[in-house]
């Protein structure tokens, strides 16, 4: 299943923070995290100096790529029908490291929020969690910009956040205090579990789309897989040679990718722990001397919504696009001081954040998934690797369904 050669990513738009005179813009201005809401209606951006911007999506029409117009205009018209949302500025009081939108919760959750927070208009229950420098987590109502909850427990920077995709309002936080914590926002933000075992800072966390597994990665080269049902450790994944700083599950939960300062992305089978392939980030322009050995250190990795591509950001000033079946990138884009990346939920756009507080939006490959891939994705959404291997089907079909072949 070879993908057609895509065009190089094109820069669609760049957002820059305002520059109030009281801020020293030479420090604490990093965009450590960017996020789209699961329905694609909002974009959040930690622009440094304790500020998060909430921006209705899509942006102005001139920034919308070809093939994206119809869906975007429909979304915009629907939004206008119920009152146009406006850009919001959230002052979090501390440097913001992690961001996560909740999925749209079920109606019972909506009533719970309205009952316990009568000051919040009952118009939307989309919420945003922000992880702060002092270990606090702040929970915001997106439509109004109101602060709903403060979650306390971590003793150091909250580096990453992840909501269960099911809409249950279970939140996982990863911290430099070497722990992960599980919070139930349906119970006033009650802390229901602390996961320990990492020996160094926990950089990232990701919950599988089927809500069965949690991945966490830390500074001791380790990747941990946890059960989201029992909150116990399933296995450790060994293979990286330096700190692991980013992780993401494929849309069907069948694959896990991890990115490290060792310049490699490793693709794993999370059910078996098998290492399927490595994607090495070779510098296009080698350094002038051997002292700069970490110039290709990775910062972020993410899956595309259809599960056919990966995007990575590295210290060598490149955004790379990878096809799963290939070991070399299929496209590059130059970007300076990149820190994070994420795909738009409906595809076609990649957002990246930089050290100077900027956000850039790039075109992403838009391809029609093959029927084979769609069938594999549908099956793997509810079948584990072991269940696939137990099926009475030919070996080649098992290899395809378990991503050993493409």
From Swiss-Prot:
Q: What keywords are annotated for this sequence in UniProt?
A: Repeat, Ubl conjugation pathway, WD repeat
Q: Which Gene3D superfamilies match?
A: SOCS box, YVTN repeat-like/Quinoprotein amine dehydrogenase
Q: Write out the coiled-coil annotation as residue ranges.
A: none
Q: Which domain of life is it from?
A: Eukaryota
Q: Give the metabolic or biological pathway.
A: Protein modification; protein ubiquitination
Q: Where are the WD repeats?
A: 107-150, 153-193, 197-236, 239-278, 293-332
From the UniProt record, give one GO term of the biological process aspect.
Answer: intracellular signal transduction
The ranges of region (Disordered) come to: 70-89
Segments forming domain SOCS box? 358-406
Q: Which residues form the signal peptide?
A: none
Keyword Repeat in record: yes
Instruction: Say if the entry is tagged with keyword Ribosomal protein.
Output: no
- State what this protein does: May be a substrate-recognition component of a SCF-like ECS (Elongin-Cullin-SOCS-box protein) E3 ubiquitin ligase complex which mediates the ubiquitination and subsequent proteasomal degradation of target proteins.
Q: What is known of its domains?
A: The SOCS box domain mediates the interaction with the Elongin BC complex, an adapter module in different E3 ubiquitin ligase complexes.
Specify the protein name.
WD repeat and SOCS box-containing protein 2
**What gene name is given for the protein in this entry?**
WSB2
């Amino acid at each position: 299943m070879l993908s057609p050669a895509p065009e190089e990513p094109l820069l669609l738009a760049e957002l820059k923070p305002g520059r109030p005179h009281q801020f020293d813009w030479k420090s604490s201005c990093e965009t450590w995290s960017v996020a789209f809401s699961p329905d694609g209606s909002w974009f959040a951006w930690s622009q440094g100096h304790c500020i998060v911007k909430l921006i209705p999506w899509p942006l102005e029409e001139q920034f919308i790529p070809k093939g994206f117009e119809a869906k975007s205009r429909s979304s915009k018209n629907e939004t206008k029908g119920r009152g146009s949302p406006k850009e919001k500025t959230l002052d979090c009081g501390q440097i913001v490291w992690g961001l996560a939108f909740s999925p749209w919760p079920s109606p019972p959750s909506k009533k719970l929020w309205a009952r316990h927070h009568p000051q919040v208009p009952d118009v939307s229950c989309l919420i945003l969690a922000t992880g702060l420098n002092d270990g606090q987590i702040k929970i915001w109502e997106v439509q109004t910009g109101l602060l709903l909850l403060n979650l306390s427990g971590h003793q150091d920077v909250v580096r990453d956040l992840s909501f269960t995709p099911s809409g249950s309002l279970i939140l996982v936080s990863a911290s430099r205090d070497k722990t992960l914590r599980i919070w139930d926002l349906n119970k006033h933000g009650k802390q229901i579990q602390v996961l320990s075992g990492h020996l160094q800072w926990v950089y990232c966390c990701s919950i599988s789309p089927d809500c069965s597994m949690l991945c966490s990665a830390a500074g001791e080269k380790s990747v941990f897989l946890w059960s989201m049902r029992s909150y116990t450790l399933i296995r450790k994944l060994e293979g990286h040679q330096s700190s692991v700083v980013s992780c993401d599950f494929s849309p069907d939960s069948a694959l896990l990718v991890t990115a490290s300062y060792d310049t490699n992305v490793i693709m794993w089978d999370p059910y078996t722990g098998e290492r399927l392939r490595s994607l090495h980030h070779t510098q296009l322009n080698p350094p002038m001397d051997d002292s700069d050995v970490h110039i290709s250190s990775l910062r972020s990795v993410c899956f595309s919504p259809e599960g056919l591509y990966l995007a990575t950001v590295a210290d060598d000033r490149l955004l790379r696009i990878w096809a799963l079946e290939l070991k070399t990138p299929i496209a590059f884009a130059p970007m300076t001081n990149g820190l994070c990346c994420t795909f738009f939920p409906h595809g076609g756009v990649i957002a990246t954040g930089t050290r100077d507080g900027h956000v850039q939006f790039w075109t992403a490959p838009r391809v029609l998934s093959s029927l084979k891939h769609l069938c594999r994705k549908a099956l793997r959404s509810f079948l584990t690797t072991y269940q696939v291997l137990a099926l009475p089907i030919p070996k080649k079909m098992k290899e395809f369904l378990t991503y050993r072949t493409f």
